[in-house]
Amino acid sequence: MEEGGGGVRSLVPGGPVLLVLCGLLEASGGGRALPQLSDDIPFRVNWPGTEFSLPTTGVLYKEDNYVIMTTAHKEKYKCILPLVTSGDEEEEKDYKGPNPRELLEPLFKQSSCSYRIESYWTYEVCHGKHIRQYHEEKETGQKINIHEYYLGNMLAKNLLFEKEREAEEKEKSNEIPTKNIEGQMTPYYPVGMGNGTPCSLKQNRPRSSTVMYICHPESKHEILSVAEVTTCEYEVVILTPLLCSHPKYRFRASPVNDIFCQSLPGSPFKPLTLRQLEQQEEILRVPFRRNKEEDLQSTKEERFPAIHKSIAIGSQPVLTVGTTHISKLTDDQLIKEFLSGSYCFRGGVGWWKYEFCYGKHVHQYHEDKDSGKTSVVVGTWNQEEHIEWAKKNTARAYHLQDDGTQTVRMVSHFYGNGDICDITDKPRQVTVKLKCKESDSPHAVTVYMLEPHSCQYILGVESPVICKILDTADENGLLSLPN
């Protein structure tokens, strides 16, 4: 709990408020049915004293929607509760406007496309037509080479009609599908797309996608996210203002709703026990503030050993990005274990996860509680093959400092002889790029994987720890323990 605006604010929806009302107070309805509080809605308890006026804007209040609360010290309060749900339900019931498909029709008719640009891939959603993922490279002579995958095309009329009919039936039965968007369950309208580029990992079955349109009044049909939910099956979330006129698809913010507990004659404006609790809390805050900065780093490392954050989400070729916080090993020990291959980096978002063991292998895998672990060898280490590769490629890249000196910026290693690729009939192979990364956290590691060509991968590993060993790289980019 914390003080704010003349009242006590709940930091967790429902919980602290109910703790105050139930732990300190005893409720009485005076013969009426007690109003219900929902755990899904955040509340803030205010103690305005004996005289105050109810708000006339925002959430609706009625004088008869209250409970009488009595504390253990016989202090009495009349707590007026907000009416938070009835308005939305009535609006949904009375709605007679266009259905969601009709609301989106202008977007499908005007042949517009939305784009999302990421570090390597660009995603193109042409509404009602197709979803494309592509990367453009300029070759010698300014020739542009395009590497692309279609993640889905508009389904045939009969299949599309079936999906629309299912969506309309769900709407009539109030079963609007929802998706967790930034912690809030948000309604969406689904549009299916199939017949995409064949997927080698699924016996050349075509890629398919579900486009999820959600209401956002200030949006311009932006692509919020692209995610591969299972192998070669994708979810694309589009923000659009067109659905916002439909009450069932409208984005609903979760404002903090005020409860006003008015003291009755003979009672203080705020319960004695609550005031004592706040005084104790204020005393505890002072040493907490003093120790906060000292403990912050160690607390993060001990309590959050593996946090993954996506910065390039979307498809099979853009495989993964992850951030890992390493436990408190000394730098020397960590470097030694990393170079020996005994400390491996693992990460990934979506269906596939990835494992990189320096000087050993790069694996791609999926774990399922029913079918077990499916693993694909992306590449294995062979020093002689790498040295041959280094003769034709840049194994050691430099950065020119302001004083004219050069430092190693990145080293690249070749891992070949992976599992045979269904598309090329050749072994998979991967180039591992190790880079120095400045970070506030000395133990932060970023791992990402790309697939610029079929079954030819790039694995990036960036960390402040690598900064300490890059300058040990020889002409072939091979690393060793620093002196």
Swiss-Prot record:
Q: Which residues are glycosylated?
A: 195
| Domain called MRH: residue spans | 111-246, 342-469
Q: What is this protein called?
A: Endoplasmic reticulum lectin 1
Q: What is its main location?
A: endoplasmic reticulum
- Where in the cell does this protein reside? Endoplasmic reticulum lumen
Outline the subunit composition: May form a complex with OS9, HSPA5, SYVN1, and SEL1L with which it interacts directly. Interacts (via PRKCSH 2 domain) with KREMEN2 (when glycosylated). Interacts with HSPA5.
Name of the gene: ERLEC1
Q: Which UniProt keywords apply?
A: Disulfide bond, Endoplasmic reticulum, Glycoprotein, Repeat, Signal
Please tell me the species this chain comes from: Homo sapiens
**What domain of life?**
Eukaryota
**What are its GO cellular component terms?**
endoplasmic reticulum lumen; endoplasmic reticulum quality control compartment
Organism lineage reads as: Eukaryota, Metazoa, Chordata, Craniata, Vertebrata
